[in-house]
Amino acid sequence: SEMCIRDRDEDHHEGQTKPAQQGSNPSCLSAGHREDADKRPTLRSMQGHVSDQQTRLSEALKRRAAEEGFNPVGIARIPGSPRLQLRTKALQRWLDHGHQADMAWMAAPRRRDPRLLLDGANSVLAVGLNYYVDAQPSPGSLKVARYGWGRDYHRVVDQRLRRIGRWLSEQRPDCGWRACVDATPLLDKAWAEEAGLGWIGKHSNLIHPERGSWMVIGHLLTTEPLNADPPARSLCGRCSACIDACPTHAIREPFVVDARRCLAFHTIENREDDLPENIRAALGPWVAGCDICQDVCPWNHRSLPQSSDPEVQPRPW
């Protein structure tokens, strides 16, 4: 005989609950109680309810990010796809070859796993901020990379991400979150690619099919399980424009930039009193950063949307 577990309401009698009984009848519920049981939440229906809530929160979070001026926005789930794991291994090879120059912080172990930055992290909201403005420096003037024309983007992106995080806390009081800009040890471009914001080009910058590579990125880690967007796929093809244009041959091979040869590194991060001779010879008018590899990218030669964000508009200097 099989064990039949009776409904407590059916067996309730004068404050007593009968023990479960064995019997030959496999149907232990009356028709009425079977109908009631059919109405009870099943695991599948409960999962569907949770999934609906997850979907609504995911979409609302992206809308909230758009309200802060971010476009594109996307979501990735931790630990990420196999391709992201390959990006993590590529970071180690890059470090092993010394391409980080003296940027020792690039080797921080936390860079390999967002869960080391936020305990219990489940999802990553990735955001992009377009800083393209159709303006050119005066002929003969010194040059600053476009991302430096406006206000310090670290502060701009961080402040906006924190507002989004506080909004998320209002929706989910028990959730944890952390705002990350590129000063945080996170594989930021790899996670942006994972969230569908664009693909990592051969010059190592993120490229969006409609906005090109003129955008800075940020991330909001959260313990909330959110719906992931499809990862972006590379559209660089056989193009080698950025590799060919680099005056110091810093792009040693597709997707591999040697900071020791990069003008941007030497004008921003290098703290030595003297620059290497090959760097001095190639500097030209560049005094802060370098945009050569992006200037020649075909994806930046399209009709790109200009940013009207007041924080990225060129300032006199």
Question: What are these regions, as identified by a protein language model?
Answer:
Residues 274-281:
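Short linker/helix segments within small regulatory modules
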Residues 143-145, 268-274:
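A short small-residue
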Residues 238:
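SIR2/sirtuin NAD+-dependent deacylase catalytic core
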Residues 6-40:
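Intrinsically disordered, low-complexity, charge-rich segments with an acidic bias
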Residues 314-317:
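Short, intrinsically disordered, charge-balanced linker/junction segments flanking boundaries
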Residues 70, 241-271, 283-311:
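Iron-sulfur cluster-binding cysteine motifs and their immediate structural context
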Residues 46-235, 285:
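Auxiliary alpha/beta "docking" domains used to position bulky ligands
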Residues 1-5:
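Short, small-residue-biased leader/transition segments that mark boundaries at the very start
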